[in-house]
């Protein structure tokens, strides 16, 4: 599989695609309800990460917080000014086996 250009997929695109998938299954669910579920999902994901929980979706991947060590003399790329950066946490995603296998052969 090869791509000429990367497309950006937004939350609205995901809601629209879910809506199409539901319509194809002959079920009815309005987009506003799908959006509520998607919004609640992302909010819960953020809340769980803020509680330092590990969020695992089998075959898809795992979200977790990782501690990034602070450092001195980091450079602000916009101003060129040197600043100190404190220890902080960052969100990290580790893809699952099925996701890794699925995207392995993608070129471009």
From Swiss-Prot:
Record-linked SMART domains: BHL
Keyword annotations of the record: DNA condensation, DNA-binding
Protein name: DNA-binding protein HBbu
One example of a Gene Ontology biological process annotation: chromosome condensation
Gene label: hbb
Superkingdom as given in the UniProt entry: Bacteria
Assigned protein family: Belongs to the bacterial histone-like protein family.
Function: Histone-like DNA-binding protein which is capable of wrapping DNA to stabilize it, and thus to prevent its denaturation under extreme environmental conditions.
An annotated Gene Ontology molecular function: DNA binding
Pfam families listed in its UniProt record: Bac_DNA_binding
Keyword DNA-binding applies: yes
GO cellular component assignments: cytosol
Organism: Borrelia turicatae
Keyword presence, DNA-binding: yes
PROSITE patterns: HISTONE_LIKE
């Amino acid at each position: 599989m090869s791509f000429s250009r990367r497309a950006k997929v937004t939350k609205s695109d995901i809601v629209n695609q879910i809506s199409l998938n539901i319509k194809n299954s002959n079920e009815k669910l309005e987009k506003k309800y799908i959006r509520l579920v998607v919004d609640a999902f992302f909010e819960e994901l953020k809340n769980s990460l803020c509680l330092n929980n590990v969020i695992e979706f089998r075959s898809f991947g795992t979200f977790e917080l990782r501690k990034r060590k602070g450092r001195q003399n980091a450079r602000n790329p916009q101003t060129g000014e040197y600043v100190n950066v404190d220890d902080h946490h960052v969100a990290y995603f580790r893809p699952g086996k099925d996701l890794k296998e699925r995207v392995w052969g993608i070129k471009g």
